[in-house]
């Protein structure tokens, strides 16, 4: 079975990568304590049950979480997988020497006990609903790695394991040619039994038009994340079905709030008014996806329906820029203190939809006197960690346009919390707000949705006014799938390969 994707992977160690396409590959190679099914609900993976207060997995005070592991699970090399591996993975995520994308919510655990090989007891400083939703969930930061192979290294940044991983998932890696191919075969030791597919070839094809041609020639079986402009063409290709399942992935524009002139809220708000968000969504994304403003999906219980995208208002944008000290120069370009208003927008190379969006934004900003250049990067450079000199993590950008995958819990501490600014996390806005930090803290200490929702509404209202980012849309990723492939069930949360052990062709 052949999968085609347009983004390369930075490495194959789930401790060190949370890139969107990598999460799918991790679901093939690894296991977590929990996973998420095609309804977006948490389901057990290596854990026997998802902890709740009702089943006794969460203590009455909310500070102790107990996971009970399946018996008889082994790594693909035959070594037993035990509670010690879970604790070791947690320790590596918190190891400051490791180039980890973010450490939240793992840093909320005060300690972890392993009273026996099949029990993991997590002690939290405070109750944390997002911890339970995210701790060791497969396909993201938290896919469990083997202690017996990695223990003893001062850090995991450059170990051979990162290109030749041993996992506990349904498949094992046979070969990886970076930028070209991952070849995977069934794991005969997989705890659910060997998967039904004889082989998976994960092909890296950096251009989405080339991927479309591959579908038309029937040389791939799954085309991951096609562009909206390819939707109608893919629907006409015989032998393929096209899925577009709304999920928690969102396209957004992020402003570097630590870098002038975007450290001025008036400039950010001016850009929000200047950009015609509806046109960007309709013309670049063909209106397939749901327009948005904040980082809470309309499909989530935490969504505030009163917070709407900024209207297109060039006059309002110019007024705000004048208040911020910018005025038109003789050639029409804005000038302040002798400095012309020039900036770059950055995204991933090879994505036609995002390039179209960048060009539309470029046109809108030209109308208000901003010279906006387009400076795109390969995914493995744009999204690399702080320690690996990533463009976003190091703040070497003005404006960035990219997709992000929100987790099933509304807590956004990792992407918006003041304590998650790189190198401590993935708050690539570099925006810091003490009120938001307080609301995030209050929101995560309750397990009841009714007690939490008000805090997330406050955060959405604040980010609307401060504009550290502006969501373009919530996506329904378009996948073209060979009709001979059975049991491919995309997920509205996390990643799409959660049940790869059930696939048949």
Q: Model segments located where?
A:
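Ligand-site clamp/hinge motif
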Residues: 159-162, 187-233, 357-362, 371-373, ...
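Aromatic- and charge-enriched surface segment that lines or borders ligand/interaction sites
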Residues: 50-99, 121, 214, 261
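Short helices/loops that flank or line small-molecule/ion binding pockets
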Residues: 78-80, 85, 209-219, 236-237, ...
């Amino acid at each position: 079975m052949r999968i085609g994707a347009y983004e390369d992977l930075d490495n194959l160690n789930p401790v060190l990568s949370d890139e969107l396409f990598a999460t799918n590959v991790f679901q093939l190679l690894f296991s977590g304590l929990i996973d998420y099914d095609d309804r977006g609900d948490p389901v057990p993976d290596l854990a026997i049950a998802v902890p709740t207060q009702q089943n006794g997995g969460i203590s009455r005070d909310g500070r102790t979480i107990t996971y009970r592991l399946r018996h008889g699970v082994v790594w693909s090399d035959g070594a037993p997988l035990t509670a010690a591996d879970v604790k070791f993975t947690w320790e590596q995520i918190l190891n400051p020497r490791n180039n980890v994308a973010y450490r939240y919510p793992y840093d909320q655990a005060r300690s972890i006990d392993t009273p026996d090989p099949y029990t993991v007891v997590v002690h939290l400083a405070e109750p944390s609903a997002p911890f339970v939703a995210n701790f060791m969930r497969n396909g993201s930061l938290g896919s469990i790695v083997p202690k017996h192979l990695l223990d003893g290294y001062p850090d995991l940044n450059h170990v051979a394991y990162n290109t030749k991983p041993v996992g506990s998932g349904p498949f094992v890696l046979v070969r990886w040619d970076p930028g070209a191919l991952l070849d995977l075969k069934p794991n005969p030791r997989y705890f659910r039994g060997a998967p039904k597919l004889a082989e998976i070839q994960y092909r890296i094809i950096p251009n989405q038009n080339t991927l479309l041609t591959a579908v038309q020639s029937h040389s791939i079986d799954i085309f991951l994340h096609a562009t909206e402009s390819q939707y109608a063409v893919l629907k006409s290709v015989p032998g393929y079905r096209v899925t577009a399942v709304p999920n928690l992935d969102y396209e957004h524009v992020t402003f570097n709030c630590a870098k002038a002139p975007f450290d001025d809220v008036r400039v950010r708000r001016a850009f929000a008014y200047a950009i015609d968000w509806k046109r960007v969504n309709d013309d670049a994304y063909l209106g397939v996806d749901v327009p948005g403003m904040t980082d809470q999906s309309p499909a989530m219980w935490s969504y505030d329906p009163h917070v709407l995208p900024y209207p297109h208002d060039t006059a309002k944008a110019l007024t705000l820029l004048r208040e911020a000290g910018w005025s038109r120069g003789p050639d029409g370009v804005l000038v302040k203190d002798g400095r012309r208003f020039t900036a770059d927008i950055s995204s991933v190379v090879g994505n036609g939809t995002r390039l179209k969006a960048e060009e539309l934004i470029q046109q809108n900003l030209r109308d208000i006197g901003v010279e906006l250049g387009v400076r795109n990067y390969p995914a493995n450079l744009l999204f690399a960690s702080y320690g690996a000199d990533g463009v976003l993590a190091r703040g070497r950008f003005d404006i960035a346009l990219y997709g992000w995958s929100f987790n099933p819990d509304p807590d956004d501490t990792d992407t918006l919390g003041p304590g998650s600014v790189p190198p401590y996390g993935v708050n690539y806005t570099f925006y810091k707000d003490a009120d938001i930090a307080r609301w995030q803290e209050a929101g995560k200490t309750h397990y009841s949705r009714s007690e939490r929702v008000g805090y997330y509404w406050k955060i959405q209202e604040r980010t609307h006014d401060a504009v550290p980012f502006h969501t373009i849309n919530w996506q329904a990723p378009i996948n073209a799938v060979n009709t001979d492939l059975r049991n491919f069930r995309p997920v509205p949360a996390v990643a799409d390969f959660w049940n790869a052990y059930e696939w048949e062709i």
